[in-house]
């Protein structure tokens, strides 16, 4: 159920280059269930910046009533968010969207989780929930450079984890697809989140496998009303789906990347 609340900042810390881990407390956490969903955050009380920021849920803790989001400071909005201190409040709308289908990976199966950059965070809650369901999780995380790497140890707590960096400064030199090929990683289902070129490469490499992709798009409303985040459906010039409400997770081939 979608709700809105002024959630309280429990903690915030810099975990990698321009990358922050923000933990929020509030009643709205009890509505957060599905990995891959996101929240829409208003970073300031004023009208500037006007639009909310869509931020993926990284970790959901119902017992503590807290959720964690990880974001990269890129513009004015996220710069303001990075200034928030414990005790401050943030206007949050959510949870929004359709997340990763857990039922696609039954107990005893092998799930490959592939994340690129700021697309890594939503895979953490997914890894946690899949592991609880008896699924073997293997993670491949891609970053530009060593300074951008985060949550390597956290993912390793759930299973085999590999890191790739574009410049070779940490882990395997190259891209996530290079790791999958070099390690001959097998899977029953693949879940991924990251930049479109990465998602496209995965969809093309595994055309006949169950592959679920979480898209990252700029959004206006977050609830499907403004049509700012539409993507086309294959084989049609007029049909489309909304990333915010139909997604952000789609099965490979469901939308044009």
Swiss-Prot record:
SUPFAM superfamilies: Ferredoxin reductase-like, C-terminal NADP-linked domain, Riboflavin synthase domain-like. Keywords: 2Fe-2S, Electron transport, FAD, Flavoprotein, Iron, Iron-sulfur, Metal-binding, Pyrimidine biosynthesis, Transport. Its cofactor is [2Fe-2S] cluster; FAD. Residues 2-102 form the FAD-binding FR-type domain. [2Fe-2S] cluster binds at residues 221, 226, 229, 244. Pfam families: DHODB_Fe-S_bind, FAD_binding_6, NAD_binding_1. The keyword S-adenosyl-L-methionine does not apply. Disulfide bonds: none annotated. The keyword Iron applies. Pathway: Pyrimidine metabolism; UMP biosynthesis via de novo pathway; orotate from (S)-dihydroorotate (NAD(+) route): step 1/1. Gene3D superfamilies: Dihydroorotate dehydrogenase, electron transfer subunit (2.10.240.10), Nucleotide-binding domain of ferredoxin-NADP reductase (FNR) module (3.40.50.80), Translation factors (2.40.30.10). Binds 1 [2Fe-2S] cluster per subunit. Binds 1 FAD per subunit. InterPro entries: Cbr1-like_FAD-bd_dom, Cyt_c3_hydrogenase_gsu, Dihydroorotate_DH_ele_sf, Dihydroorotate_DH_Fe-S-bd, Dihydroorotate_DHASE_ETsu, FAD-bd_FR_type, FNR_nucleotide-bd, OxRdtase_FAD/NAD-bd. It comes from the Bacteria. FAD binds at residues 53-56, 70-72, 77-78. GO terms for molecular function: 2 iron, 2 sulfur cluster binding; electron transfer activity; flavin adenine dinucleotide binding; metal ion binding; oxidoreductase activity. One of its GO terms (biological process) is 'de novo' UMP biosynthetic process. Belongs to the PyrK family. Responsible for channeling the electrons from the oxidation of dihydroorotate from the FMN redox center in the PyrD type B subunit to the ultimate electron acceptor NAD(+). Heterotetramer of 2 PyrK and 2 PyrD type B subunits. PANTHER family: DIHYDROOROTATE DEHYDROGENASE B (NAD(+)), ELECTRON TRANSFER SUBUNIT, DIHYDROOROTATE DEHYDROGENASE B (NAD(+)), ELECTRON TRANSFER SUBUNIT-RELATED. This is Dihydroorotate dehydrogenase B (NAD(+)), electron transfer subunit.
